Amino acid sequence: MFNFFDINEIIGRFPDKADSTIVDTYLTDEPSASSRLFRVYYPIPRHSHETCEEHLYLLTGKVSFAIENEAPRVLTAGQLVTFERNTVHAITEVLESPAVFFTVDAPRRVPTDVVYVNPDDAKIRPFVTHLEDL
């Protein structure tokens, strides 16, 4: 099986504004790994994922990215960050929009696998809306 994707066309379909923290779309979704594009609209509170490693490649924009207890660092388009499951990470600020990531989660991450360091952060706004649901 194989797939071809027009990444720029998909990025162009993301809305200018959203009620959720991110809007995403799955490119592939297999038990061994999933790949997605997502646009960040608001800072993402400190959280981790229990079920997968994450590989984040910033396609467009600029964000302030924090991981574990390190000071936030600026990620710009063309940069990649990878980390293992249970690694606490956050986007503390969207510095340039649109901030769009290509991500690979291995194995597949179920959408509900977002464990906030501060559970109250889950109440700020919905975490994700799927592009196909808009």
Can you say where each PLM-predicted feature lies in the sequence?
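Ligand-binding loop in jelly-roll beta-barrel domains
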Residues: 85-114
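Structural motif
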Residues: 34, 55, 62-64, 88, ...
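Short, conserved beta-strand element in jelly-roll/cupin
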Residues: 39-41, 49-65, 104-107
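Short acidic-glycine-tyrosine-enriched beta hairpin
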Residues: 69-85
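Short histidine-centered beta-strand/loop micro-motifs
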Residues: 26, 45-50, 67, 73-74, ...
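Short strand-connecting beta-turns/loops that link adjacent beta-strands
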Residues: 31-32, 70, 96-97
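Short loop/turn positions at the edges of beta-strands in beta-sheet-rich folds
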Residues: 50-52, 59, 69, 85, ...
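A short, N-terminal "cap"/entry segment at the start of jelly-roll beta-barrel domains
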Residues: 1-37, 45-46, 117-134
